[in-house]
Amino acid sequence: MGMIGAFFDFDKTLLETESAKLGFQYLWERRLISFGFLLRILIANFFYQRHLLSDEFVGRIFLKFYRGKKLEEFTNGAPLFYRQYLKPRLAPNILCKVREHQKNGHVLILISGSVRYLLEPVIEDIGFDHLLCTDLEVGADGQLTGRANGPFCINKTKRTLASHLAQKHGIDLSRSYAYGNHQSDIPLLEMVGFPFAVEPTEPLRKVAFKRNWPILGFK
């Protein structure tokens, strides 16, 4: 009999808001981002929230910010950013679920389209066993290219990565749990025995009702 896993999405699931939004707010307050680029982000997010742009399209826009920069610029500040911006906005009810799974000895996996340097302080503080996420591409010159290194960890890619991890570590998906908020999380949610929709978008809410998936709130 395999181990039981618990897969948690991050943005608007374990975190009550979007980590990228907080990240760009942090950069804007420190004058590290131009008004023009911030405007592009706001416009893209406006259309994304209305389901008019895909996760990957918006993700590509976000990642262009990193082009020509050093990864160390961001990894060095990530722990402070987590403590000041992310940790105070963790969803109490979902964090409680994480603790329940920890208590029961389940394998904890944080799975998110967000970038690795933002999420590493999260898994270290909370105690996740594995992290599946989007990686930034580093060029031959040691600078970030503004692209992802591999696929974005979204949609069906989440399912693929989760499946590979489960096979590698002996996780029984039929006895495992998954938590997500967005219709793009459906491929992940439907692969486990116990899926949960967290403050779901309307498309995910409809699927959850149809399939009798429990719906959870942040608090």
Protein language model features and the residues they cover:
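Metal-dependent phosphoesterase signature
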Residues: 57-93
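N-terminal alpha-helical segment
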Residues: 38-40, 55-58
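C-terminal cap/substrate-recognition subdomain and adjoining C-terminal extension
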Residues: 2-3, 76, 83-219
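A general structural signal for well-ordered alpha-helical segments in protein cores
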Residues: 20-21, 59, 159
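Active-site phosphate/ATP/adenylate-binding loop shared across adenylate-forming ligases
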Residues: 49, 65-69, 136
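Active-site neighborhood of HAD-like aspartate-dependent phosphohydrolases
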Residues: 1-50
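Conserved alpha/beta cores of soluble small-molecule-handling proteins
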Residues: 4, 32, 49, 53, ...
